[in-house]
Amino acid sequence: MAIKIYKPTTNGRRHMTSSDFAEITKTKPEKTLLESQSHTAGRNSYGHITVRHRGGGHKQKYRIIDFKRNKDNTKAVVKAIEYDPNRTANIALLHYTDGIKAYILAPKGLKVGDIVESGDSVDIKPGNALALKNIPSGTSIHNIELKPGKGGQLVRSAGASAQVLGVDGDYTLVRLQSGEVRKILSSCRATIGVVGNEQHSLIKLGKAGRKRWLGKRPQSRGSVMNPNDHPHGGGEGKAPVGRPQPMTPWGKKARGIKTRDTKKASEKLIIRRRKGSK
């Protein structure tokens, strides 16, 4: 992937960048692997806003991704690398030898014509999926399961990867992108390699409208709201917070509060917290 830089023909184009989509080999998705999806604009079934700053955006079809990678001992050919509007990573279209088609996250270096497979004794190469206990220490992995058979939940964004550190009894030690070292059951599966489209984080949207296409609405500061909308609101002109410390929109302390429940069941599986945490 390379970054495409635009000429500053307008204010919106100035500093704007995008992907050149050089890796994309097919523009129309596989119809049998599509599902319709409806957007709720951050509302629940009562119509109340539960997630702020969402709404609008371009209509999209959901691509059904195979996160489980449980089709063992059956080789698949990479037929295409496609764009997926629902995620930052690109996706790869697989054709299995038994006629089944599936999408997977496209790892860095995967090309059309490559062979990928899943199982306990497959080669350690990008795109292959196997249990953590069969992956050598130091290997970069992505799409990691937390429960055997549930499907990959960790490390799925563009450019992300984790590293296998070693085995500790029934668990495998994995260093995540954040720096956190965590125990994961050795029977859980992961995919070899780094997630592709690694320069996605360098893209600059350039204008507000491009953000709206993604379904993201503007975010206002609490200090410019009315007092019935936010604890920081109200006052004459640029008024201070008016409280001992900043508050969330729902009246809770915004700083100094732990963001993770210390009684969470998975707490004992975390060997070292992420970088910057206390």
UniProtKB/Swiss-Prot annotation:
Under InterPro entries, the record lists: NA-bd_OB-fold (IPR012340), Rib_uL2_dom2 (IPR014722), Ribosomal_uL2 (IPR002171), Ribosomal_uL2_bac/org-type (IPR005880), Ribosomal_uL2_C (IPR022669), Ribosomal_uL2_CS (IPR022671), Ribosomal_uL2_dom3 (IPR014726), Ribosomal_uL2_RNA-bd_dom (IPR022666)
| SUPFAM superfamilies in alphabetical order | Nucleic acid-binding proteins, Translation proteins SH3-like domain
Q: List, as start-end ranges, the regions of compositional bias called Basic and acidic residues.
A: 258-270
Q: Which residues form a coiled coil?
A: none
Keyword set for this entry? Ribonucleoprotein, Ribosomal protein, RNA-binding, rRNA-binding
Protein task: One of the primary rRNA binding proteins. Required for association of the 30S and 50S subunits to form the 70S ribosome, for tRNA binding and peptide bond formation. It has been suggested to have peptidyltransferase activity; this is somewhat controversial. Makes several contacts with the 16S rRNA in the 70S ribosome.
User: How does this chain assemble?
Assistant: Part of the 50S ribosomal subunit. Forms a bridge to the 30S subunit in the 70S ribosome.
Q: Which NCBIfam families match?
A: rplB_bact
The protein in question is named: Large ribosomal subunit protein uL2
Q: Which species expresses this protein natively?
A: Lactobacillus helveticus (strain DPC 4571)
What taxonomic ancestry is recorded? Bacteria, Bacillati, Bacillota, Bacilli, Lactobacillales
